Design a protein with these regions (language model features):
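Conserved acetyl-CoA-binding loop-helix of GNAT-fold acetyltransferases
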Residues: 76, 82-95, 118, 122
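A short helix-loop-beta-strand connector motif used in the catalytic cores of GNAT acetyltransferases and
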Residues: 38-49, 70
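Conserved GNAT acetyl-CoA-binding A-motif
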Residues: 97-109
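Conserved beta-strand in the GNAT
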Residues: 49, 55-63, 70-75
Length: 142
């Protein structure tokens, strides 16, 4: 497995991976090609992808608010799961964030997603049951 930075040329493969991994996709909002291209231009290192034989089999989007780093959109092709790809992408995310001086790493995980919760616990993350997530959106497309 090779981990390398994704580029906008990988966009179609990213969308296919999200679909195969059953991640929701907002093509008119945050996941549009234009939005992803802008983020990749601003922070190219925030888009690591895992490849097997030049095939995208895993990826993550990293973000930070200068205090905490966020692991977002972690996806692994179901045919390639249980091979350490997700853990490698988490480790790569932490390494990238440490280079920016970030020392707190976070992930938002849907309550029903037991597999992801188990994965992050195995990677040393602590579940905070006393925290409730709020959001406000300008539309359902974003």
């Amino acid at each position: 497995m090779e981990i390398r930075k994704l580029t906008i040329n990988d966009y179609e493969e990213i969308i296919k991976l999200w679909s195969k991994a059953r991640l929701p996709y907002k093509p008119k909002g945050r996941d549009s090609k234009e939005a992803i291209a802008a983020e990749m231009k601003a922070n190219p290192e925030f888009f690591p992808g895992a490849f097997e034989d030049n095939r995208l089999v895993g990826m993550v989007i990293i973000s930070c608010d200068m205090r905490r780093g966020w692991i977002n959109r972690l996806a692994v092709d179901p045919d390639y799961r249980n091979r350490g790809i997700a853990k490698a992408l988490i480790a790569e995310s932490e390494k990238t964030l440490r280079k920016r001086g970030i020392r707190i790493f976070c992930a938002l995980i849907e309550d029903y997603n037991a597999v992801s919760k188990k994965l992050f616990k195995e990677c040393g993350y602590v579940e905070h049951r006393d925290t409730i997530y709020f959001s406000k959106r300008d539309s359902n497309e974003v």
